[in-house]
Regions:
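Hydrophobic beta-strand residues in large extracellular and virion-surface proteins
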Residues: 7, 28-31, 77, 93, ...
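Mid-to-C-terminal Rossmann-like scaffold of FAD/NAD(P)H-dependent oxidoreductases
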Residues: 2, 180-184, 201-202, 211, ...
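N-terminal Rossmann-like dinucleotide/flavin-binding domain of flavoprotein oxidoreductases
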Residues: 39-99, 175-199, 208-211
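FAD-binding core/adjacent interface of flavoenzyme oxidoreductases
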Residues: 1-8, 23-24, 36, 74-141, ...
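Predominantly flavin-linked oxidoreductase catalytic cores and closely associated redox partners
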Residues: 87, 91, 99-196, 203-205
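Residues within well-ordered alpha helices
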Residues: 20, 69, 105, 185-186, ...
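Rossmann-like dinucleotide/flavin-binding elements
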Residues: 2-33, 129-176, 222-223, 239-281
């Protein structure tokens, strides 16, 4: 009888790990739901730095190829999450009341978006995915993007093609990015304004139903007001998801929940590494 492995998370790391294990003769189940293990890769408009795609590829398409390859290898993917993990000699997995037993458990649950908090935020629509919600806005609208990393840059770029103006609010004195070409393209956009060393302090109303965003610049006593912004896109990083674990069994982890690089290529390699470690254990 083949050994059985269960993987929490159907992103690049989890699917790479599953594909390698299945190729080695393991029986592999992958559990994933939208709340805590759905891959952020599906939200990427274009991935230009993953090897094998010289012209880039949409995130959702790349993820679909990962899924197809895993399923072709014999991996079973289930659209439900794991509630808890109990481990002694075996790993007992609880999926909404149904119990399953496995020889090994891999956590590839990715991360969840970090929320932004300030007074009055309920006065303006807040979004955490430009690809998902950017289409809600048009050429007459102004939107604000909070953040200064790769996700904020790609989100601002995407939105700049949809709306009248994008105001990017960056807390630090510069942006931090891995794709200089994307950042240079963003800087060349005439409808993008980048406010460095600035934070959104609070949101108020102008009395006519329109939100007013109050930005505070470093070392300045007065705030700058943005009147008429229609939406706010928050891109300030993410936090690792966790699954409740009871027992002394080892937990294998791979992907974004175990490193801070947040790169598809690293996640895939990490998943492959964990699979090889399991096979050789």
């Amino acid at each position: 009888m083949s050994k059985k492995a269960v993987i929490a998370g159907a992103g690049p790391a989890g699917l790479a790990c599953a594909t390698y294990l299945a190729g080695a003769g393991w029986s592999v189940d992958v559990f994933s739901n939208e709340e805590n293990t759905e891959s952020c890769l599906a939200e990427a408009s274009i991935v230009k730095n993953y090897p094998g795609f010289p012209n880039g590829i949409e995130g959702v398409e790349l993820l679909g190829l990962f899924v197809e390859q895993a399923q072709n290898a014999g991996v079973a993917i289930h659209p439900e999450g794991i509630s808890s993990v109990h481990s002694d000699d075996k790993y007992i997995i609880d999926t909404n009341g149904a119990m399953h037993s496995y020889d090994e458990y891999v956590e590839a649950v990715g991360c969840r978006r970090r929320e932004y908090r300030c007074d009055g935020l309920e006065l303006i629509p807040v979004h955490y995915c430009a690809i998902c919600d950017g289409g809600l806005y048009g050429k007459e609208d102004v939107v604000v993007v909070i953040g200064g990393g790769d996700t904020a840059i790609s989100s601002a770029l995407y939105l700049s093609n949809l709306v009248k103006m994008v105001v990017m609010v960056v807390r630090k004195p510069n942006c931090r990015f891995t794709n200089k070409k994307a950042f240079d393209e963003l800087c060349s956009k005439r409808n993008v304004v980048i406010e460095y060393e600035t934070q959104l302090h609070h949101v108020s109303s102008n009395g006519k139903g329109n939100p007013v965003l109050h930005l505070m610049h470093k070392n300045q006593c007065s705030d700058e007001m943005i009147v008429g912004a229609k939406g706010l896109f928050v891109c300030i990083g993410c936090e690792s998801n966790v699954v409740e674990h009871v027992g002394n069994g080892r937990i294998w982890r791979c992907g974004d929940c175990s490193n801070d690089k947040k790169q598809v290529a690293i996640a895939v390699g990490d998943g492959a590494r964990v699979a090889l470690d399991i096979i050789g254990a």
